[in-house]
Amino acid sequence: MTDSTRSLRNCLAPAKLNLFLHITGRRPNGYHDLQSVFQLLNWGDTLHFTLRDDGRVARVTDVPGVPEESDLVVRAANLLKAHTGTTAGVDIEIDKCLPMGAGLGGGSSDAATTLLALNRLWQLDLSRTELQSLAVKLGADVPFFVFGKNAFAEGIGEELAEVELPTRWFLVVTPRVHVPTAEIFSDELLTRNTKPVTIADFLAQQNSDAGWPDSFGRNDMQQVVTSKYAEVAQVVKWLYNVTPARMTGSGASVFAAFQSKHEAEAAKAQLPTGWNGAVAESLNEHPLFAFAS
């Protein structure tokens, strides 16, 4: 990342994985109570921010299928302007890397990186807690990325506690299919009564590499998604021939963990022709963590 008084360039918006995802209940308002562990990855979209003197917020790169006015990065910047009253403006460039609708948190991470970067570039000095209170207005996953550490999440995803995770390499395979999150959450076959677990339960298991991630929990959405989307089912089945694998979020991406980059790259090299796979190392902290206190 490069930093000047007029711009912040090469700001990573890291992807996330749900190492497990349990649905423990459903609220009267339709929202679901969840438990999950969020893992940051050293892989994601790259954003660039340049000050404008006219006060405008402008996205200067096209993102296919995402109108500028509804883009989370533009909404995040405008939300920050409205909250603080700053007269500063910004040009935002986005180098998209993460597939959309894949369960990797791409749009949410872009929004969080925007909040953190503009907190620095606009010299706002908002606290992390204050930024998280804004982030929740943009989406359920955005507060996690502002939180900036690997986390045990509860509630609807807004109750976060830092969790220490070992360094691992991941192979993430994304089928060429978009899985609508709302469709999966509304499916009558979705498990909604998984018994709650604790951080201690998770930590006792995740330090053992044998069979991980199968050694703890599951993704309650995976069975519904694989029954509806054959492409996701094919990836899960193929990866299981190599190593234990699991879907992240509501899909469609599926991941497997390895002890080394070499092992992950070797598995990627075996992927069937035309499959989209990426190798990424785990992160302990968001690259812009220091931009809020």
From Swiss-Prot:
According to UniProt, this protein's pathway is:
Isoprenoid biosynthesis; isopentenyl diphosphate biosynthesis via DXP pathway; isopentenyl diphosphate from 1-deoxy-D-xylulose 5-phosphate: step 3/6
For this UniProt record, give its keywords in alphabetical order, as a comma-separated list.
ATP-binding, Isoprene biosynthesis, Kinase, Nucleotide-binding, Transferase
| Single Gene Ontology BP annotation | terpenoid biosynthetic process
Q: Known SUPFAM superfamilies for this protein?
A: GHMP Kinase, C-terminal domain, Ribosomal protein S5 domain 2-like
> Where do the TM regions start and end?
none
The EC number of this protein is 2.7.1.148
User: Catalytic center at which residues?
Assistant: 16, 141
* Catalysed reactions listed for this entry: 4-CDP-2-C-methyl-D-erythritol + ATP = 4-CDP-2-C-methyl-D-erythritol 2-phosphate + ADP + H(+)
Cleaved signal peptide residues: none
Q: Which residues are listed for ATP binding in this entry?
A: 99-109
Q: Name one GO molecular function term.
A: ATP binding
Q: What class of enzyme is it?
A: transferase
From what superkingdom does this record's organism come? Bacteria
Q: Which PANTHER family match?
A: 4-DIPHOSPHOCYTIDYL-2-C-METHYL-D-ERYTHRITOL KINASE, CHLOROPLASTIC
Tell me what this protein is called. 4-diphosphocytidyl-2-C-methyl-D-erythritol kinase
Can you name the source organism? Burkholderia ambifaria (strain ATCC BAA-244 / DSM 16087 / CCUG 44356 / LMG 19182 / AMMD) (Burkholderia cepacia (strain AMMD))
Its gene name is ispE
